Curated annotation (Swiss-Prot):
PANTHER family: GLYCOSYLTRANSFERASE (PTHR21015:SF22), UDP-N-ACETYLGLUCOSAMINE--N-ACETYLMURAMYL-(PENTAPEPTIDE) PYROPHOSPHORYL-UNDECAPRENOL N-ACETYLGLUCOSAMINE TRANSFERASE 1 (PTHR21015)
Top-level enzyme category: transferase
Pfam family, one: Glyco_tran_28_C
Pathway(s) served: Cell wall biogenesis; peptidoglycan biosynthesis
Membrane topology designation: Peripheral membrane protein
Origin species: Salmonella enteritidis PT4 (strain P125109)
This protein's GO CC annotations: plasma membrane
Name of the protein in question: UDP-N-acetylglucosamine--N-acetylmuramyl-(pentapeptide) pyrophosphoryl-undecaprenol N-acetylglucosamine transferase
Locations listed in the record: Cell inner membrane
Keyword Ribosomal protein: no
Amino acid sequence: MSGQPKRLMVMAGGTGGHVFPGLAVAHHLMSQGWQVRWLGTADRMEADLVPKHGIDIDFIRISGLRGKGVKALLAAPLRIFNAWRQARAIMKRFKPDVVLGMGGYVSGPGGLAAWSLGIPVVLHEQNGIAGLTNQWLAKIATTVMQAFPGAFPNAEVVGNPVRTDVLALPLPQVRLAGRDGPIRVLVVGGSQGARVLNQTMPQVAARLGDTVTIWHQSGKGVQHTVEQAYAGVGQPQHKVTEFIDDMAAAYAWADVVVCRSGALTVSEIAAAGLPAIFVPFQHKDRQQYWNALPLENAGAAKIFEQPQFTVEAVADTLAGWSREALLTMAERARAVSIPDATERVASEVSRVART
C-alpha cells in the first residue's frame, strides 16, 4: 500500500455479536497496514474490550429507544442529533477513508455522521433479519452485506466473521473419527445463561442416563444451582461451568450443541462443523429463529421454539441421533459455513476505500 495508510472507523457496540465480528475485520485490516479506530459507547462491553485489542476507541452518548416510554421517545430526536454531532466531530479529527457499521445503537448516528461528511458507509448485518438501525442506514450506505440470506433482498451473503481458533479446528470427519462412548452434549446459554436450558437439561440427562455426557455452561451466578439440579436427578457426573473461556476447545470436545441461536453462535457452530439443537430467544422480530433456519434447512440442526423445548422432545431427539447421523449433520453444518467471512468483509471495505 503506497503513501499514507488507509483509515477505517468501525462502528459497533452493545453485544459480542456486534463487537467480535468487528474486531476480526479490524485485526485483518490492521495486519495489512490500515489505521483503525472504533466508535462506541462508554457504558457497554466495547469500552473495555476494544482497547484490550490494541484499538483506540471514541465514545458517543446514545442508547436504545425500544420500550423506553413516551418521554424518552419525545427526547429521542435531540439525543440522536447530539450523538450525530459528537460522531461528526470525532470523524472530522480522524478522517477515515471508510466507516464500517457492524450494528448496535452507535451505528445510527455514526453512519449518518459519516454520510454527512461524504465518507463511504459499509454495513454488515449479522442477523437473519435486519435490525432497525441497519434497515434505516441501508438507504444511505455505499455497500450492504449480510451474514444470512433474507435480511436484505439484494445484499451479498458473506457470513459472519468468527474467531480464528474456531476456524482452525479440524474438519468434522477428522475430529469425530473413531469416537465412541456417550454422546458429548455441550449446553451453552451465552454469557448470561438461559433459564430454560438450565431448568430442562438436567431432566434430559436423567432420561438419557449414561448414553450422554454433558458440559453445561450455566451463565453467571447459577453454577451451583444447576449442579444441584443435575445431582438432584441422580446425574452429578456432568460438568457445569459458569463460563467457558476457550469456546474452540469446547466445540472440539462436543458431538452436538444445545444453545440459543444468536448470530455469532450460529456462525461459529457452522464454522466448527457441529450439529445443534437451537432454542431461539423469544424476541418480537424472531431474529434468532431466522439465524438458525439455514442450518435446519441444511439438515444440520433442529430448532425448538421455547414452548416446544420440553424434556421429552429434547431427550427423544438426542436419543434418535446415532454417531453416524451426527457426523453427517456436522459435515452439512460445515458445508454451509462461510469460513472466509472476515476476508470478504475486509475486501469490500478495501474496495470501497479505493473508489
